[in-house]
Amino acid sequence: RDCLLSRGLGDVYKRQVYYKISESGIMQRRDLMAEQRELIIKLGQKITDRIGVKVTTEDPEYWGLAGVVTDEMAEVALGMKVRVPMTLEQVAKKCKKSVERTEQLLQEMSVIGLIEYNWENEDRHKQYILPMFVPGSAEFMVMNGRQVEEHPEVADFFEQMSRLPLEKVTPMVPPGGAGIGMHVIPVETAIPATPESVSIEHISYWLNKYKDKYAVGACSCRRQQRVRGEGTGDIEGDLCIGVGDMADYLVETGRGHYADIDEVMAILKRAEDNGYVHQITNIDGEDKIFAICNCAVGVCNALRTSQLFNTPNMSRSAYRASVTPDRCVACGRCVQYCPTGAAKLGQKLCTKNGPVEYPQHELPDTVKWGPEKWDKNYRDNNQINCYDTGTAPCKSACPAHLPVQGYIKLASQGRYMDALKLIKTENPFPAVCGAICNRKCEDACTRGTIDQAVAIDEIKKFIAEQELHESNRYIPETVNHEGKQFEQKIAIIGAGPAGMSAAYYLRCKGYPVDIFEKEKTPGGMILNGIPSFRLEEQVIEAEVDVLRKMGIGFKCGVEVGRDITIEQLRQQGYKAFYIAIGAQGGRKLGIAGEDADGVIAGVEFLKKINPDEKSAHIKGRTVVVGGGNVAVDVARTALRAGASEVTMVCLEDRASMPAAKDEIEEALEENITINNSWGPKEILTAGGKVTGIVFRKCTAVRDAQGRFNPQYDENDTMTIECDNVLVSVGQSVVWGSLIEGTKVELNPNMTVKADPVTYQTAEPDIFVGGDVYTGPRFAIDAIAAGKEACESIHRYVHKGHSLTLGRNLRQFPSLDKDNLAIEPDSYDNAPRQACHKKTDENGLTFRDLRSTFTEEQVKKEAARCLGCGATVVDPNKCIGCGLCTTKCEFDAIHLSRDIPEASTMRKSEDKMKAILPYMLKREIKIKFKKDK
């Protein structure tokens, strides 16, 4: 995709097109095509609905049947008419076989999937039907699990027969689908009974019609794509609901089990929770369906009919979604779950040229339509989150892309737990981040162009502190799409923010997860590398406790590579590994005297400090080398640990220091001296102990290309006498024996090589994230990486699923803040709220003295938000499934019955009666437009 190319990932991301054939299927096809069986050719020709095609051994109608259908079975089927019920005796007479042999063959053909049953007659006697291929026998063949594994070409057969017959006809199909395939039926809650709606638009109508006659079976589309290697992370399971006679057929042929209404309703609810589209069969008119499917756009052949060909009439319901902009807060939940990419994030604020005008998808109604109009990469393109003009800068800037506007609005309404749940869809550790986040969202905040940015992090901190009390903790559900647990065990190595984030989201998906941590307590660098006056241990413990309550196992004091190897963990049943051990080692200066007593790596110093001890941990004059946030933490900790005076020295000038501005100010308030633009030259020693350090003037930190390449004036030096030198000039990954015996490869700086989209290493079952991949960054970066790893691992442990196909790449471009027209009377003019420090007798306590907003301050600060972003729905892309309405917490998106004719359901045999008039009108429109 274009966004990948812009990130330089074009060589990594392999685009997959809609007509891929599975490798195993190709091999089977070749064998089947080598022999020409006339009866199979005749049968394929009889059933196919491809107009004008003469079936040969090279066609799917042949090789899709040849591997599973015997010539004798073909003789029976050739004596039947497509979709015409026949009794056993009638079939036996037509094929000129005994009733006993015919019954035996029909039973075998039913198990294969070539024949279905029917009891819709006066005395409810059993009849047999030769169904069409799709929907029909191609699906039934794939629903036979053992068969599709032995004959993978059946999966390719299903794929092609759901596509090839439609390639020319789809632009001419009117609303309602003309009796072809499937039809979207909205989420029931999205269309409450009103005078406008009709009965067939409600799932409840169909469930009542087939009361007490339900069966549940595996999704043929998900299985087909998995067999073909084109799974998109939507795992097959009991998601398809057969009704009426189809329920009996599924059970009698071993394709499913009977279900009561409670099980059916639970399946429908889980489908909506997971973003699956409800569809009903649409080949029998308005009085009959035989299945309710719960479809994922990445794998569903029925949804593909509208998405590949860009012809929404093939799928859409009578409804379309629309947004009330004043209520929308651009949280992105509707966008995330929209199957067609109709809902995208845009902006609410006007530009200097007026409101943004968003493009609408081209439709085939008035233009010629051919392959050049198709979207062969619809599975990827439907995952694009934003219009090119961008959305709220806060969401864009946050590495985890938190729904900032959303949780601010919920907080303003006093809905604090709802706000917490919304935050945790992207960040399981908001209290931790509330204390230590680098606040990229605030740096980007549009309000900052007027006066001061909204205090986003303080609002989040207030929300997160609601669950620091054990009774208030939000424990998410930990079940998969079937309401069960997956069997695949996942091992996380490293209990830092990346590892615990991956564990959280994997557990939310229903995976059994264990975290291996070499330290005695989980937390990683946020526990061992951040002083408690910035992040108190009880804050970490409260959020870690949520993971424990979710059932995540913590195996602390276990160093993988030393105490147990990855191979031994494989033998224990772990199917994938996520390495997130952080950059826990320090970097050396590379100067004389660095090995002297009194020289300590900053990160090692932070690990050793125990704030509960009253005795000093360090004595004398202390110099901290470095200018980043960790260096500031080291300096402030040294002061609390007993240093008589602390001096920071760094290469950068004051304006260029990597440390956050507020952290620099806090250091200065504590009388820590900061010397800028100096680089270490030599550590002075006496008797093996530090006595001082010599610096040289730094004239430039980076070269003309922006690369780190410090330049010095060797004639301008400075000597500082000291007893300790704490080195904080970067961090390194300490691998130990962790990756010995694996194929994992490292970069020269000891970070790991991995795919930039999936984080998969050269060892397929090992994924990485956080500082081991990026080098030292912030906690929020690691948290975001952990969630991405969850998606990759989820796909990896299920054979046949692509790690990239149909994947949401989480691209959220920012709107142009320089092109906004913000009227002075359009926003609240209140100043930014400020937190005050807690009073303490000892100003150098290890306690965090920063306070949290009051509830009143939260409401005042929330009112300062400009509400930059909003969802925009393209009506030409919307298929009226209603999933968006189930995700919105703000009553901002609704369905309206804009296309009532889309509820017209026809029998398959009558499709041309609908297509021909519509086709004629379309041709007239095209000609009129051309002449005009």
Model-based region annotation:
Residues 595-619, 702-776:
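FAD-site-proximal beta/loop scaffold in flavoenzymes
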Residues 772-797:
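A conserved FAD-binding loop/helix module that cradles the flavin
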Residues 124-163:
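Short, amphipathic alpha-helical interaction segments positioned at domain boundaries
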Residues 340-393, 408, 454-456, 460-489, ...:
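Flanking helices and flexible, charged tails adjoining ferredoxin-like Fe-S electron-transfer domains
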Residues 402-412, 453-457, 492-560, 587-592, ...:
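Beta1-alpha1 glycine-rich phosphate/pyrophosphate-binding loop at the start
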